[in-house]
A protein has these predicted regions:
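Predominantly soluble domains enriched in secretory-pathway, periplasmic, or organellar proteins
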Residues: 23
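Phosphate-group recognition and catalysis centered on beta-loop-alpha active-site segments
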Residues: 26-301
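Positively charged n-region of N-terminal signal peptides that target proteins for export
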Residues: 4-12
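Sec-dependent N-terminal signal peptides
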Residues: 11-20
Length: 301
């Protein structure tokens, strides 16, 4: 009887140790993704910003894509020039953003805008350098190390803007896949808030790794908007809680949190054992990850 109890205790301790190791492994291997490159310290979505993010040790890079009037993919968070980040070609502040529709501009025109020297109070540590919105192909050619990183490829798309500041989804999706096929990239996750562009990508290639972005609470309702199960969701970090994580784990859907910039918020996300954190300050979150430890969770991965 006592031998049987001893064996049971040994078995329990082995399982407990393995669970603890798996939990720590999951936390230490959680991806840290540079948001728009490394925008806490460098201008967003610029070649210089992507280089800095890689230098700081990110596991992945997040960038945003729009289209110019030549059908080329441009790295930009908006399909126009944001007044908070850019100066016009004459060096003047931008007042009416709608005047500068990237979808109606050539890349030569786009290059004339300076989106790197304007001070932004939200990012006081950001280094000021003259920088323009690059083409996707320029980033890949000028930052070759990026090919080995996981790419979080956010497609800027909004239904009211179809045909105005962007192509319609069917053409947009084929344009993206045709261009990306020219490059040898290690791993791409296509992301969007627009379900229609994700649907078109899924139709063209059901094997694509697709991430549905959402800033709303109630993830089950959001997922019902899609005709397929996405590989992952990208959620505003304040909407993530244990219940949300458990629902997504039961559905075998990955979870990425955006945009997490404070150590305490990073630790909270790590306690949920999610798949990755998207951050403006990669070094800060990488350091937080390296020092974090907690009790084992119930999550499978």
């Amino acid at each position: 009887f006592f031998m049987d109890q001893t064996n049971k205790m040994k078995y329990f301790l082995i399982i407990l140790c393995l669970s603890l190791q798996m939990s720590i492994f999951a936390q230490n291997t959680m991806m840290v993704v540079g948001h728009r490159g490394c925008r806490g310290v460098m201008p967003e979505n610029t070649i210089e910003g992507f280089r800095e993010a890689i230098k700081r040790g990110v596991d992945g890079i997040e960038w945003d894509v729009v289209v110019n009037n030549q059908g080329q993919l441009v790295i930009s968070h908006e399909p126009y020039f944001h007044k908070d980040f850019c100066f016009d070609p004459q060096g003047n502040p931008i007042e009416d953003e709608t005047r500068y529709n990237i979808y109606r501009m050539s890349q030569m025109q786009i290059k004339g805008f300076d989106c790197g020297t304007k001070f932004h109070k939200g990012f006081p540590e950001q280094q000021k350098i003259k920088a323009s919105k690059p083409l996707l192909k320029e980033v890949i050619n000028m930052v070759p190390e990026i090919r080995s990183k996981r790419i979080f490829f956010e497609i800027k798309s909004d239904e009211p803007e179809y045909g105005i500041s962007q192509p319609f989804p069917e053409y947009y999706a084929s344009l993206i896949l045709n261009e990306v096929s020219r490059y040898k990239l290690r791993s791409i996750r296509y992301m969007s808030f627009d379900k229609n562009i994700l649907e078109e990508l899924h139709k063209l290639d059901p094997t694509l790794n697709l991430v549905y972005l959402s800033e709303k609470k109630g993830i089950k309702k959001s997922l019902k908007e899609l005709s397929f199960k996405p590989n992952s969701v990208g959620l505003y970090y304040r909407t993530i809680n244990k219940r949300t994580v458990n629902i997504l784990r039961d559905l075998d859907i990955g979870i990425y949190a955006w945009t997490v910039n404070q150590i305490e918020d990073g630790h909270k996300m790590m306690s949920f054992a999610i798949d990755g954190i998207i951050t403006d300050y990669p070094r800060r979150i990488i350091e937080a990850r390296s020092t974090y430890s907690s009790k084992p969770k119930r999550f499978r991965h």
